[in-house]
Structures are given as structure tokens and as C-alpha cells.
């Protein structure tokens, strides 16, 4: 063994150390012994073991550096993930780059990404012929172009190489998969790997499985799984995790569970796959159970796990578990990572804890458009559209440029506030930014104008759209329905079908609601029956609720009840629609039956008790009304007060039941009393029905 080889082992160990002290001591020993200047091999190890700043200082002191020393300096920067600094070293290296130099620099270009620098390096590789002869350079070129979203460059680099090996072929498959070109990835794998007799590696198969998952290609995914079993690749945990993710992605939860239970080794990725898969399949209880088992097994969650569990808590909703997960995110140091923080803000918003959401949002050092959109949407969901608009204004002045998805959230907030002038301003902004050309933005605009009472503008936006998808058609149908123009809504539905646009679940909600508001019973029945028979759309609770409302308004209570009893999955909202119809048609006997069913489904909803109380009051059943009020008091239930708003001279005036905060309340009250006297005087055609006026208990 040469005299410097033990020193090499020590330097390699120092490179793996978290502090530069050991490397500095060895450096001093090499200087004293004279080994440093006599062996570039040892010098390269010193460079690799030092922090990048010290390594650069040492490199600059070398009179005539070699490619090996230059590569050691580059490797130190790449290991530290200092991609930009690695590229800035190019003019300071003072050597002609070899194949290894180009591979390191191309990796830095891929990770930034820096396509222009990558192309310049490609030209250098062509001049030195390494692009055609060195497999590592060719693979680095393919990887760089793929990361820079330039698969044409990857294809050219691959085709230029004389004899591509398995590494280069794997780079192509991975590049296609990472660029969401799953079909091309599977085709390349079939033609250039399997078709030419190459044995795919586990790395190749991970990309193939991921491509099959993107396409939800059950046949190819299962074929890969069988190949893994036949070739004893089940030892590769990364590969098995990819198969697990594939089964979850295609909705084969039972197959994923069987694979999971048969795994002898499980890491954090394995558990995260299960949690994420359960969330995506809507099985929130299983997701939270899997997470708890993971913690019990001593597996430390990572950022991906935290995001999935937080999403589960959002959907549950379970604020207490969400807070516990937040604490774990703080402990493992990922709380303020963009994806984690955004998921936490969304969870707090969906659990009606908007103050906690804003505290976390304000602590985020970086906020992308998704984070801002979550806050804007969250305030709207919590009934605070004015706060949504305030946040949007802050985004315009100090945040990232809003994307189209963010603007849809802003339009939804504006539609809740109902300020027409604001709607016009937002429409103008969308025209300037060019977002109006996107169909889903046009659909949100139609919905905005409809809810603000300007059906004419909604129609003009709809008619000006160059393309119309099912969402845009549904928004316009809903707009007609909101304005009581049910016949026009039905006619538009027929035009949509004639235009070869297949209606979806949302479309039927819109058209059935329109029929309900306009009393179009027969049309509503016909459309409801056509859902399954003609269009293959299975009615859900919302459709049944719309039909119950339609039949109830028409007085067909028995048929509405029959429809509900035939649907075993009817929710509380659907039964509430029938109870409201019973109240409107004074059917007390059916009201009590429906109320019993309703309160069994949701015993803590104050609004249902309020509705039942109005029925008892109308029948002058004071004992039942009193008993009903006692239940509300004993359970501590509070009904959210009704709120009305009117825009006057660009100012929104809000009136809440039971409150008198308006500065002109006395004038308004005096005018209302005059209207009441006029109505009761008999000089007008309208006669007030005192039975429908009750004091809110």
C-alpha cells in the first residue's frame, strides 16, 4: 500500500463529516509532510472534504490545476447543492473540461434549471466529441434537457449517441415520465428496452410504473409488478414503493393493502403512499389510522406525510388532530416549507380557524400563487368575502402575479359579496391579463355576473367564449335558474346536448334547480329520469335534494317522500328540503315524521329546530314549540343570523337579523313602518300574511 493511501481513507471519512475540523487537521498534516503538493490525488480529496468556500480558496492557490482538481471543486459544490455557484466556476477552472466536468456542470444546469447554459455545454460536448462517445455525458445531456422541459433536446442527444447503454435508455424513460409524457415513456420502454433485449434495472422500472400510474394503465402496471416478482426485484424498496403508489393511484386500494401487509421492510415513503392513497380515495378514517400506526411503528414522518395527513384533517374535518400534526411539522423543521405551510393554512381555513391560518400565512417567508389562492378561497368559505378581496389587493401590491386559478377564487369571493362595480373592475383586469380566454375563467365570470344580478353581462360573456365546455354551459344554465328563467335554462340545456357536449353531475344540479325555481315539474321529472337512462350519470344527494325541492314546491309531498325513502343515502340537506316543503304546504303530520328523521341525521343543527319551531308556531302548538326551544337552549345551539346586503352608490350596506348597526337605522325603520301601514290599509293588491311572520326565537 502506498504511503498516501491511508491518508486518502482519512480524507474520505472527513468528507462525510458534518464539520470541516477533521479535514483541516489532515490538510495541515499533508502540508507539513509534503504529501499535498506531491499528489494531486490527495489534493482532490482535500478539496472534496472542505466546505465550498475553503475549497475554492485552496483551489485558487494551486498554480497549475488539473482536470481532476477542477472536478473535485465542482463535486464539492454539487454535493452542497450550490448549483448556481458551480456554473459560476466555469471561467475560474483554468482547465479544459473533460467528460466528468461536463457531467457535473450539466447536472447543475438540470437542477436549476438553466437551459441556456445547458445548451452551451452541449455545444462544448459536441466539439470535444464526448456527446457521441461518453455515455455519462450523453445521459447527463438527456437528464438536463428533460429537467428543463425540453424533451426534443433529450431525443436529439439520445439519437446522436452511437451505442446507447441501459443508463442512457433509463434516462430517456425517466425524462418522458417526469415531463408528464407517460404514453411516450411506455412506448420508448417497449421499443428501445424490451424490444431490443435489454434487461431493465429497478430504476427503469420505477419510471415505467410511475408512467403507468399517470395513465392509470392497469395492464402495463400489473405486467411490471409481475416482472418484478419473476426477477426477484422485490428487495428494492424504492421499486416496491412505486408499485404501491401505482395501485393507490388507480384506486385499487385492496391490492395496495395486500402488497403493504406483505412487505417485510417499510420506510417513511411506504407509509406516506398509504396515507396519500387513502386520502385520494376519500377514506379519511383509514388515512388517519395509517398515520397513527406509522407513528406507533417509530417511523418519523417527512414533509410529504405531513401534507397528506393535514389534507385528511381538512376533509374530516378534525382540527385537534390537525394541530397535533402541525406540532410535529414544527419539530421536524418542515412547518414553513411551501407545500406544508400551504396545506396547514388550508386545513385551518376549512376548520373555520381563519385567525390561526392567517398567523401561519404571515410567517411564511415565501408565498406562491397557490398559498395566496388558499387564503382567498378560505375567507370566502368562512363567509368573509370582503377579507378575501382585501387579501387579493395585498397580493397585487406585494405578492406574486395572480394566475388564472387564483383569479377564479377571487371571482368567487366577489360573487359572494355581490358588489357590481368590483365585478366590472375584475372583468377589466381579466381582459388586460388575457385570462378571459380560458374557459374556466369565463365560467366563473358568468357565475359572478349571475349572482350579482346582471344576467345580461353573464349572457354576453357566455356568447363571446370561443369554446364552451360543460362547466361554462352549466354556469349559464345556473344563471338562468337563479333569475327564475327556468324555461330558458331548459332550452339552453337542450342546446348544450345538441352541441355534442355531454352534461355532467353539476349540469343536472343546475338545470334541476332551475326547474324547481320556475315550477317546471314535468320537465324536471323528465330530465331527472334521463340522467341514468340516457347520460349514465348516477344521481347523488344534491340531485335528490333538487328533485325533492321541485316536487315539494309543487305540492307533491307524497311523491317527494317516496323518492327519499327509495334513496337510502339521502343526507340531512335533502330531508331538510322536504321539511321546508311540508312547512310551506302546512302538512304538520308529515313534518313531524320528516323532522324526526332529519334530527336523527344531524341533531345539532340549529336551523332545523328553527324550521320545526315555525311549523309548531303556525299550528299554534305552543307546548311543542316551547319544548323545541328548550332543546335548543339545553344543547347550546345558535342559529347563524340571516344577513341581507344592498349596494348603493358603490357602497355595500349590510343588515343582520337582530342587529341595528346601520347609521341610518331610524330613517329605515320609519320608512318600513310606513310601508307596513300602506300594505295593511287595503289600498294595494298585496295583502300581508301574518301567519308567515314569526319572531325569531
Where are these regions (language model features)?
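Terminal (and in a subset, N-terminal) low-complexity or junction segments at the ends
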Residues: 1-165, 171-267, 273-697
Amino acid at each position: 500500500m502506498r504511503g498516501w493511501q491511508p491518508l486518502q481513507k482519512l480524507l474520505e471519512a472527513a468528507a462525510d463529516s458534518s464539520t470541516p475540523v477533521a479535514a483541516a487537521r489532515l490538510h495541515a498534516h499533508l502540508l507539513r509532510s509534503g504529501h499535498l503538493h506531491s499528489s494531486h490525488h490527495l489534493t482532490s480529496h482535500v478539496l472534496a472534504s472542505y466546505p465550498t468556500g475553503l475549497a475554492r480558496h485552496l483551489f485558487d492557490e494551486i498554480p497549475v490545476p488539473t482536470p481532476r482538481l477542477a472536478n473535485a471543486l465542482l463535486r464539492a459544490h454539487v454535493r452542497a447543492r450550490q448549483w448556481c455557484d458551480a456554473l459560476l466556476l466555469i471561467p475560474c477552472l483554468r482547465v479544459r473540461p473533460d467528460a466528468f466536468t461536463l457531467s457535473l456542470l450539466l447536472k447543475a444546469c438540470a437542477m436549476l434549471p438553466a437551459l441556456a447554459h445547458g445548451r452551451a455545454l452541449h455545444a462544448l460536448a459536441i466539439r470535444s466529441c464526448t456527446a457521441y462517445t461518453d455515455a455519462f455525458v450523453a445521459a447527463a445531456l438527456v437528464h438536463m434537457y428533460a429537467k428543463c422541459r425540453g424533451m426534443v433536446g433529450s431525443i436529439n442527444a439520445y439519437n446522436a449517441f452511437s451505442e446507447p447503454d441501459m443508463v442512457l435508455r433509463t434516462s430517456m424513460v425517466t425524462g418522458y415520465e417526469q415531463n408528464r409524457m407517460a404514453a411516450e415513456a411506455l412506448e420508448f420502454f417497449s421499443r428501445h428496452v424490451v424490444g431490443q433485449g435489454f434487461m431493465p434495472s429497478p430504476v427503469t422500472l420505477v419510471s415505467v410504473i410511475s408512467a403507468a400510474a399517470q395513465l392509470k394503465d392497469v395492464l402495463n402496471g400489473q405486467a411490471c409488478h409481475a416482472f418484478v416478482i419473476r426477477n426477484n426485484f422485490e428487495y428494492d424498496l424504492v421499486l416496491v414503493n412505486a408499485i404501491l403508489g401505482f395501485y393507490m393511484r388507480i384506486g385499487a386500494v385492496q391490492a395496495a393493502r395486500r402488497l403493504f401487509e406483505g412487505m417485510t421492510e417499510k420506510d417513511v415513503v411506504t407509509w406516506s403512499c398509504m396515507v396519500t392513497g387513502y386520502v385520494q380515495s376519500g377514506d379519511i378514517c383509514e388515512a388517519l389510522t395509517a398515520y397513527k400506526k406509522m407513528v406507533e411503528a417509530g417511523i418519523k414522518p417527512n414533509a410529504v406525510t405531513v401534507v397528506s395527513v393535514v389534507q385528511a384533517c381538512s376533509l374530516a374535518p378534525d382540527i385537534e388532530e390537525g394541530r397535533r400534526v402541525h406540532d410535529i411539522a414544527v419539530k421536524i423543521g418542515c412547518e414553513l416549507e411551501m407545500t406544508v405551510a400551504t396545506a396547514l393554512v388550508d386545513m385551518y381555513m376549512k376548520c373555520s380557524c381563519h385567525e390561526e391560518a392567517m398567523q401561519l400565512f404571515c410567517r411564511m417567508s415565501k408565498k406562491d400563487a397557490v398559498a395566496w389562492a388558499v387564503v382567498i378561497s378560505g375567507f370566502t368559505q368562512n363567509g368573509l368575502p370582503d377579507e378575501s378581496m382585501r387579501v387579493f389587493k395585498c397580493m397585487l401590491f406585494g405578492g406574486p402575479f395572480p394566475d388564472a386559478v387564483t383569479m377564479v377564487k377571487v371571482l368567487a369571493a366577489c360573487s359572494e359579496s355581490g358588489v357590481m362595480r368590483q365585478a366590472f373592475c375584475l372583468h377589466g383586469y381579466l381582459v388586460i391579463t388575457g385570462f378571459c380566454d380560458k374557459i374556466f375563467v369565463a365560467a366563473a365570470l358568468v357565475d359572478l355576473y349571475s349572482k350579482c344580478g346582471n344576467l345580461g353581462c353573464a349572457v354576453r360573456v357566455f356568447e363571446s367564449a370561443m369554446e364552451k365546455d360543460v362547466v361554462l354551459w352549466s354556469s349559464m344554465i345556473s344563471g338562468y335558474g337563479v333569475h327564475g328563467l327556468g324555461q330558458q335554462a331548459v332550452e339552453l340545456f337542450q342546446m348544450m346536448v345538441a352541441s355534442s357536449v355531454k352534461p355532467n353531475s353539476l349540469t343536472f344540479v343546475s338545470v334541476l334547480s332551475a326547474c324547481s325555481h320556475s315550477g317546471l315539474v314535468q320537465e324536471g321529472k323528465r330530465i331527472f329520469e334521463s340522467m341514468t337512462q340516457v347520460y349514465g350519470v348516477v344521481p347523488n344527494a344534491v340531485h335528490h335534494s333538487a328533485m325533492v325541492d321541485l316536487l315539494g314546491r309543487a305540492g307533491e309531498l307524497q311523491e317527494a317522500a317516496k323518492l327519499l325513502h327509495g334513496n337510502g343515502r339521502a343526507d340531512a340537506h335533502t330531508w331538510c328540503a322536504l321539511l321546508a316543503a311540508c312547512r310551506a304546504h302546512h302538512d304538520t303530520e308529515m313534518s313531524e315524521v320528516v323532522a324526526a328523521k332529519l334530527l336523527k341525521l344531524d341533531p345539532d343543527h340549529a336551523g332545523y329546530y328553527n324550521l320545526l319551531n315555525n311549523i309548531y308556531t303556525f299550528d299554534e302548538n305552543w307546548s311543542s314549540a316551547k319544548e323545541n326551544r328548550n332543546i335548543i337552549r339545553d344543547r347550546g345551539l345558535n342559529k347563524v343570523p340571516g344577513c341581507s346586503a344592498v349596494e348603493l352608490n358603490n357602497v355595500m350596506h349590510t343588515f343582520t337579523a337582530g342587529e341595528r348597526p346601520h347609521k341610518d337605522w331610524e330613517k329605515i325603520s320609519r320608512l318600513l313602518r310606513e310601508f307596513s301601514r300602506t300594505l295593511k290599509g287595503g289600498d294595494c293588491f298585496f295583502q300581508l300574511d301574518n301567519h308567515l311572520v314569526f319572531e325569531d326565537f
